[in-house]
A protein has these predicted regions:
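Feature captures the catalytic ectodomains and active-site-proximal regions of enzymes
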Residues: 1-402
Length: 402
């Protein structure tokens, strides 16, 4: 038996005015997903427990079968693990976004966050900037590490997680940052690093070139997602099978790595609609040759939600359907039996541009046990089935049951 999870990050949504008050799932042409849904168990699942923030960290841990109430220590430590940082028990890791702040004469605290990802800056440009920041601001206490695109890492030696509210930048796009900077005393050294980064980055040659090319500058770091070293139990130890992960983003690769799952590196995997869809599908099939389960994560729908791009979100769903699922179907033909689970981790509604905690649609298809499902899967048809998984982390055990 082989198992495949296809995770469409942030795919679920609310009705979108620009889409005639339909959701992207309703608008997308997705014949392959709908074909599975017609022969599968379909329902809703609550991936984010009450009291937890609806982040991709918590939600993906749930889908992968790890209870965040037991295992979650923060977002950035998982990303740090992915890029090979060996954290000490006394270290604190913080996500370090490269963002675009308004270029005006106002004090730093009064600037507006124009883009949480600096126009989806390339990994190559970002590495130059993060290494420059580490050269100028790094100390024995603070060390910056480059990651992928706009997503990077700060390790704080003997740091604290008692930092007040360190707001995710994608939650406040278009807003003045004054009320979103932590006022906690322990956070002030971090706020100072952010302020100093603006002065260092605003006239950096990389940003001068970006502006000349019509792109937004990556003119500040933004620190959030703090946490201590994670301690996940190995996936195989819990579930008795070998698992693997395919993703463009460090967070998901970090969860997989911490759980002792095999993690693929796919050239051209970007985390946006320009990602190497075929490469990720083929990497998943390669992993299935020596693993029992593969978890394929696609970031693009989530990014489009954050960026208020309804047409691109629809297209992201369609591209996975066109360019990933057919490859998986063909590659799975040789196995006597297999199961496929498709779902988002959480909604990323276009109208709010940030994550939500609402239950999300899921489907579980079993090759040798096809059942009557729904003609098309979306938020409404999944709800109409009456199937509901209240405890998100239980979905993995359910998926693996015969």
């Amino acid at each position: 038996m082989k198992y495949v999870v296809v995770l469409y990050d942030g795919m679920a949504d609310y009705p979108v005015p620009a889409l005639d008050r339909k959701t992207p799932m309703m608008c997308a042409k997705k014949p392959n997903m709908d074909m599975l849904a017609s022969k599968a168990e379909v329902g809703l699942i609550r991936t984010v427990a009450e009291g937890l923030k609806p982040g991709s960290d918590v939600a993906n841990m749930s889908v992968m079968g790890f209870d965040p109430m037991k295992y979650y220590t923060g977002r950035s430590p998982l990303e740090a693990a992915s890029i090979g940082i060996d954290m000490k028990s006394t270290d604190v890791s913080l996500r370090t976004n490269l963002v675009t702040l308004s270029e005006d004469d106002l004090p730093y605290e009064e600037k507006t966050i124009e883009d949480y990802c600096a126009d989806d800056i390339s990994t190559e440009e970002a590495e130059i900037l993060i290494k420059f920041i580490d050269e100028k601001l790094g100390t024995d206490e603070f060390k910056f590490y480059p990651g992928v695109s706009y997503r990077h890492c700060l390790i704080w030696d003997n740091g604290t997680i008692d930092l007040g509210k360190m707001t995710p930048p994608h939650d406040i796009t278009g807003k003045v940052i004054t009320e979103h900077l932590s006022t906690a005393e322990n956070a002030q050294p971090l706020i100072e690093l952010m302020k100093k980064s603006y002065d260092l980055l605003k006239d950096h040659p990389v940003n001068i070139a970006r502006k000349a090319a019509g792109k937004r500058p990556a003119n500040s770091i933004w620190l959030w997602g703090e946490g201590k070293r994670p301690a996940l139990s190995p996936f195989e130890e819990i579930y008795g099978i070998k698992g693997a992960v395919v993703s463009a983003v460090d967070l998901i690769k970090g969860i997989g790595g911490c759980a002792k799952m095999e993690v693929a590196e796919v050239e051209g995997a970007t985390g946006y609609i320009d990602t190497n869809f075929e490469g990720k599908a083929n990497a998943a099939l390669d992993l299935l040759e020596r693993n029992d389960l593969v978890y394929i994560h696609f970031e693009a729908p989530d990014e489009c939600g954050h960026r208020n791009e309804p047409e691109n979100k629809v297209r992201a769903i369609e591209m996975i359907d066109e360019r990933v699922l057919p490859i998986l179907f063909k590659g799975l033909e040789k196995f006597d039996d297999y199961k496929i689970m498709i779902l988002p981790d959480h909604p990323t509604p276009i109208v709010t541009r940030t994550h939500a905690s609402d239950p999300v649609p899921y489907l579980i298809y079993h090759k040798n046990n096809e059942i009557s499902g729904v003609d098309t899967i979306n938020e409404e048809t999944a709800k109409a089935t009456g199937n509901f998984v209240e405890h998100g982390p239980s979905i993995m055990k359910h998926f693996l049951e015969d």
